[in-house]
Amino acid sequence: MASGREIKTKIKSVQNTRKVTRALEMVSASKIRKAQDRMKTSRPYAQAMKQVIGHLAQASTDYQHPFLVEREQVKRVGFIVISSDRGLAGGLNNNLFRKMLGEAKAWQDKGAEVDLVTIGQKASTFFRRVKVNMVGSVTHIGDVPKLESLIGVIKVMLDAFTEGKIDRVYLVYNRFVNTMVQKASFDQLLPLPPAEKQVAHHDWDYLYEPDAATVLEHVMTRYIESLVYQALLENVASEHAARMVAMKAASDNANKLIGTLQLVYNKARQAAITQEISEIVGGAAAV
């Protein structure tokens, strides 16, 4: 059995660790509400953009934007993978990466090649170690991400799709369901899935200048950027929720370990006292 001093040292070490996990839990709890607010605030913009594109697509029946045209054969697939910059978020990132590798292998088994751009330090570090062709990366996105920091990697995929180098693009991220549940999601980004036809609730039509096709050309890129940005906000909220839950579990485990070590310490102390008493009694009897 370890000595009382060694056990006390272990207890002190676990208590210090518990202070860190509790602090991280409280920080994540305070950040998650702000992240949820940003996520909810951005949703109406993406929904409005989707409606506008639906109107524009119907107004320009003689023109189909390249982002709306399905390719007959998929020879190369692109993925935009979003992760966190920091760890200590349970299995949030690893679960996403494992599913991403499975999806990439499935396409490779079909004979398609895979290209990847990553958003977030964890994804960048992980996929540089595996046999996946990374064509772009951005890190240090922070808790309040800016759209400007994403435009570069988004453009890499948009240009590749426009030039015919990539036939399909997926957006991979952790969708925020609630504080306890975050779901790894694979959304098809390009070509855009067919939008539902807009039902007219009025007797007038829209007038586009110079024409619907030109407006659609400008709006489409903004819409793609808004989808990636929305996914990033979902992932940030998921990160804080996962970290809060993971740190709470770590704090609870620390409490259990401290209780166990305290019990061991009490038994060791009791055994030492019993030994001392036995020695005193034995010495007195000898006299």
From Swiss-Prot:
Recall the GO molecular function terms of this protein's record. Answer: ATP binding; proton-transporting ATP synthase activity, rotational mechanism
Fetch the CDD domains from UniProt: F1-ATPase_gamma (cd12151)
User: What does the entry give for GO biological process?
Assistant: proton motive force-driven plasma membrane ATP synthesis
List keywords of the entry alphabetically: ATP synthesis, Cell inner membrane, Cell membrane, CF(1), Hydrogen ion transport, Ion transport, Membrane, Transport
- The keyword Coiled coil appears for this protein: no
GO cellular component terms, A-Z: plasma membrane; proton-transporting ATP synthase complex
Q: Which domain of life is it from?
A: Bacteria
How this chain sits in the membrane, per its record, is: Peripheral membrane protein
> Where in or outside the cell?
Cell inner membrane
Q: How does it assemble?
A: F-type ATPases have 2 components, CF(1) - the catalytic core - and CF(0) - the membrane proton channel. CF(1) has five subunits: alpha(3), beta(3), gamma(1), delta(1), epsilon(1). CF(0) has three main subunits: a, b and c.
Matching PANTHER family: ATP SYNTHASE GAMMA CHAIN, ATP SYNTHASE SUBUNIT GAMMA, MITOCHONDRIAL
Q: Which HAMAP family match?
A: ATP_synth_gamma_bact
Main function: Produces ATP from ADP in the presence of a proton gradient across the membrane. The gamma chain is believed to be important in regulating ATPase activity and the flow of protons through the CF(0) complex.
Please state which protein family the record places this protein in: Belongs to the ATPase gamma chain family.
Name the chain's protein. Answer: ATP synthase gamma chain
Q: Which organism is it from?
A: Stenotrophomonas maltophilia (strain K279a)
